[in-house]
């Protein structure tokens, strides 16, 4: 995603995960708090232990810095979604994981930036959905799908 970006646990740099996961949101918060002077409820917390839940809680009560963190995260993920839509034309993209609990705080910026970065021909055609599956169910269904795929081969 980002050339010379953040180091990822996989050993590469700039992976989408480092910006748009729960850990990525917490990392963005720590970066913003280090380089900026904006007032924020997040400043009341230990910078080394800030979580995405802390950012969500602050954003939920209108904290401008926390809202900007979700906007920035949504912009990065929205741009990536636009790229994905351009080469694959899916009917929908289904989001999954703990960060989706942020709801519209995350999904609205994703939707806005995806649409903004799409060619006109693709705009308004791809649904962005949040999975209702439990994490344990998703793992089982994913493993099952691999079995179905192998059987078809």
Regions found by a protein language model. Give the residues of each.
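ATP-binding/phosphotransfer module of carbohydrate and carboxylate kinases, centering on a glycine-rich
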Residues: 3-7, 12-153
């Amino acid at each position: 995603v980002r050339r010379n970006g953040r180091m990822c646990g996989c050993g590469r740099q700039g992976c989408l995960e480092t910006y748009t996961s729960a850990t990525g949101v917490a990392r963005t918060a720590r970066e913003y708090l280090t380089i900026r002077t904006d007032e924020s409820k997040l400043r009341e917390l230990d910078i080394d232990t800030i979580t995405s839940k802390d950012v969500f809680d602050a954003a939920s009560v209108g904290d401008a810095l926390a809202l900007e963190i979700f906007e920035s995260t949504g912009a990065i993920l929205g741009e990536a979604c636009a790229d994905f839509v351009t080469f694959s034309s899916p009917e929908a993209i289904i989001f999954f994981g703990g960060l989706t609990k942020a709801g519209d705080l995350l999904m609205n910026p994703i939707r806005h930036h995806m649409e903004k970065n799409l060619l006109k021909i693709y705009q308004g055609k791809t649904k962005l959905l949040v999975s209702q599956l439990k994490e344990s169910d998703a793992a089982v269904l994913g493993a099952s799908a691999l079995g179905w795929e192998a059987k078809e081969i």
